């Protein structure tokens, strides 16, 4: 009889532990880490005699979004790739790239991205999310020479979306 009661208690406690574990294990990732971004890689504008693209590195970069007080990248050093969020509430996003923010705030380029925002239902926990794709873009040409769209869909896996070509600064 004691063994039967002991077995019942063990099964009862094990059932509660398993039930608690499985009910809490399906947490959805609604964090900012799950948000799709535009991933950019920096390249040096090739000379006419060059046939191979070479990666570029900016000494310093600060990126802000026009119309907000947010700093997306704050004085990051040795930049060769960056991930930028697109706006959910508008069909365009404007980024300002400051190359020497503290020394010369006028040394900057503006990148204008026109995007398509398509809402979709993700889950009961997360609600709606947004699929975003680039429709077109424009930019100033202070330091930036050109931009090539390599993938129009914003993504979470780090796939390159934009190739940013900078003039040779040597």
Residue ranges and their predicted role:
Residues 1-34:
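Bacterial Sec-dependent N-terminal signal peptides
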Residues 27, 48-50, 71:
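Intrinsically disordered, low-complexity segments enriched in polar/charged residues with Gly/Pro
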Residues 72-78:
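Short beta-strand segments within Ig-like beta-sandwich modules, predominantly Fibronectin type-III
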Residues 5, 9, 47, 79-81:
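Intrinsically disordered, low-complexity segments enriched in glycine/proline and serine/threonine
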Residues 46, 67-69, 101-103:
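Solvent-exposed strand-loop boundary residues in beta-sheet-rich modules
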Residues 41-54:
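Structural motif
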Residues 24-32, 37, 41, 78-170:
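Extracytoplasmic cysteine-anchoring/structural motifs
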Residues 51-70:
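Extended low-complexity, serine/threonine- and proline-enriched intrinsically disordered segments
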